[in-house]
């Protein structure tokens, strides 16, 4: 007789956004907002094994900003990040996760020489680029479930300038970044009130988003299930759309 996963104690992690889909009662989400939008209170923040990321040079020269994410996803709003950079006198932006030219869409983003595109990068190349950045420009137009781009950037000492959607208000406090849904306010803040410490950003990521904490919190979830309880009283389900959030130019 075949047995399904439901016949065994189990925990399911949901990393993405869903709409109108009933999920397993033992679902864990990756931020408080992510959980609440699915009618749940069960979440564990993603944690990284920072030893895998190598050494961070907190005294490195930082003379550009960066965007990190799948630029082809409209909700990541790389165009918004480019517009922010272009609105700041002399600012340069390095786009990690996208190309200037796309065969299907042509010249998608900008001809500006102040904007550089690096495609999908990883390893030492990615670490080096993040370590030289003054900040992540991240004006997403959806409810971000978590955002590894945020914690990775913070680890390398780069503050986060983003929109107040999804997990961002939970992850980005005033010591490590600034959130707004308006381009002009983001530009004005970066130009006139940039006060961020690479050391503070780095230590915050190390202390709050590490693999040890994540493992400990998952163990608590596993113990709850092994004791015969479910993580949610009902099957979690999101009923409110998670995209098309506002970005004012």
Which residues make up each language-model segment?
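Conserved donor-binding/catalytic core segment of Leloir-type glycosyltransferases
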Residues: 41-48, 52-96
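Nucleotide-sugar-dependent
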Residues: 72-76, 141-148, 169-170
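Short glycine/acidic-rich beta->alpha loop that forms part of the nucleotide-sugar donor binding site
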Residues: 144-147, 154, 164
């Amino acid at each position: 007789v075949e047995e399904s996963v439901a016949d065994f104690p189990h925990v399911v992690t949901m990393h993405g956004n869903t709409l109108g889909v009933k999920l397993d009662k033992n679902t864990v989400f990756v931020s408080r907002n992510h959980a609440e939008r699915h009618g749940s209170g069960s979440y564990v923040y993603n944690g990284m094994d920072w030893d895998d990321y190598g050494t961070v040079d907190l005294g490195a020269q930082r003379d550009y900003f960066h965007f990190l994410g799948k630029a082809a996803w409209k909700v990541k709003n790389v165009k918004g990040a480019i517009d922010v950079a272009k609105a700041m006198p002399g600012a340069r932006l390095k786009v990690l996760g996208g190309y200037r030219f796309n065969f299907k869409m042509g010249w998608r983003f900008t001809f500006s020489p102040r904007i550089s595109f690096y495609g999908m990068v990883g390893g030492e190349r990615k670490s080096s680029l993040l370590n030289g950045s003054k900040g992540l420009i991240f004006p997403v137009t959806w409810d971000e479930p978590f955002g590894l781009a945020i914690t990775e950037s913070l680890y390398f000492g780069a503050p986060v300038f983003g929109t107040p959607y999804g997990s961002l208000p939970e992850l980005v406090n005033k010591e490590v970044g600034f959130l707004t849904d308006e381009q002009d306010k983001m530009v004005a803040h970066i130009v006139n009130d940039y006060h961020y410490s690479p050391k503070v950003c780095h230590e915050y990521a190390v202390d709050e988003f590490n693999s040890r904490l994540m493992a400990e919190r998952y163990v608590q979830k596993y113990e709850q299930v092994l004791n015969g309880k479910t993580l949610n009283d009902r099957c979690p389900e999101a009923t409110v759309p998670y995209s098309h959030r506002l970005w004012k130019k």
